[in-house]
Amino acid sequence: MTAILAKNEASSLWARFCEWITSTENRLYIGWFGVIMIPTLLTATSVFIIAFIAAPPVDIDGIREPVSGSLLYGNNIISGAVVPTSNAIGLHFYPIWEAASLDEWLYNGGPYQLIVCHFFLGICCYMGREWELSYRLGMRPWIAVAYSAPVAAATAVFIIYPIGQGSFSDGMPLGISGTFNFMIVFQAEHNILMHPFHMLGVAGVFGGSLFSAMHGSLVTSSLIRETTENESANEGYKFGQEEETYNIVAAHGYFGRLIFQYASFNNSRSLHFFLAAWPVVGIWFTALGISTMAFNLNGFNFNQSVVDSQGRVLNTWADIINRANLGMEVMHERNAHNFPLDLASVEAPSVNA
């Protein structure tokens, strides 16, 4: 009898725990994805803060020339970063217990891999948690679908690109100037500005900003007056009210006359779907572009200059881009190799002639 009561009590405790985890009445929804998300994101955030402040220099290129990234080693908020794991480690899984000592782990940039792996798990679980909460509330799943765009982008620069290039040292540094350095080197090595998927991503981001500003300004300009001149227009809206707070017909008429009739949406649902889908699809394409360039399927190149009938080069914008790319590549890892790969791969002339 005692065993049965103990079993029922344990079962009841587990049932209460499950109910609490999946309850939509909590101030913050946890969910089963949250059980993984919370510790992974807390770990990534804690290690990032500690490493950004106090991590020792990292031998990023694997040539015994450490690069400092933390505040205590001479950097500021702009120049500071968590430096990627050493090229000497490559793609090997490098937890603390794989290193001979903590000093070796820090010297080889172990914190970067720890942060990136936990961050990746955390944001994936955050996306799953969005879907889980939507499911339990009876909502459609598009919030998680929209969030998949930044998840795909982060996965591309932190996971797929290092895999394609053969080393976590090629991942994006975790800092402001490190991000810009990553972008410049990416352009030098892959000519990303001439990749169609990057162009679609630019159209998605800037187009999304434009459409968001247009929508917000149209709605704000066509609010239904509910207040006096001495009150804020925001006081005219009560949370949960059934009435429309703006006149979509007026906004539609204004924009249709400003551009042309069919440039304006007359359906609020299709309008908001478009506002969500445009930047999401653009960022999906950018992430796909990064993922293909990770394996050196690069942007268009025009390495063969345009020449006239006499063989003289006719300088074009492509020549300027090529020179800029070579210049950026020369500055990158200047102590690891003497020339950019484009120049080093040229066959040397014979000296026996």
UniProtKB/Swiss-Prot annotation:
Chain positions recorded as a quinone binding sites: 215, 264-265
Marked site (Tyrosine radical intermediate) residue numbers: 161
Keyword Oxidoreductase part of the UniProt annotation: yes
Residues that hold chlorophyll a PD1 according to the record: 198
Location(s), subcellular: Plastid, Chloroplast thylakoid membrane
Residues bearing the modification Phosphothreonine: 2
Binding site for [CaMn4O5] cluster: 170, 189, 332-333, 342, 344
InterPro entries, sorted: D1/D2, Photo_II_D1/D2_sf, Photo_RC_L/M, Photo_RC_L/M_CS, PSII_D1
Sequence positions that bind pheophytin a: 126
GO molecular function annotations of the record: chlorophyll binding; electron transporter, transferring electrons within the cyclic electron transport pathway of photosynthesis activity; iron ion binding; oxidoreductase activity, acting on diphenols and related substances as donors, oxygen as acceptor; oxygen evolving activity
Record PTM: The 9 C-terminal residues are removed, probably by CTPA (AC O04073); processing is essential to allow assembly of the oxygen-evolving complex and thus photosynthetic growth.
Catalysed transformations (reactions): 2 a plastoquinone + 4 hnu + 2 H2O = 2 a plastoquinol + O2
Other comment: 2 of the reaction center chlorophylls (ChlD1 and ChlD2) are entirely coordinated by water.
Family: Belongs to the reaction center PufL/M/PsbA/D family.
Name under which the protein is recorded: Photosystem II protein D1
Origin species: Tetradesmus obliquus (Green alga)
Upper classification of the organism: Eukaryota, Viridiplantae, Chlorophyta, core chlorophytes, Chlorophyceae
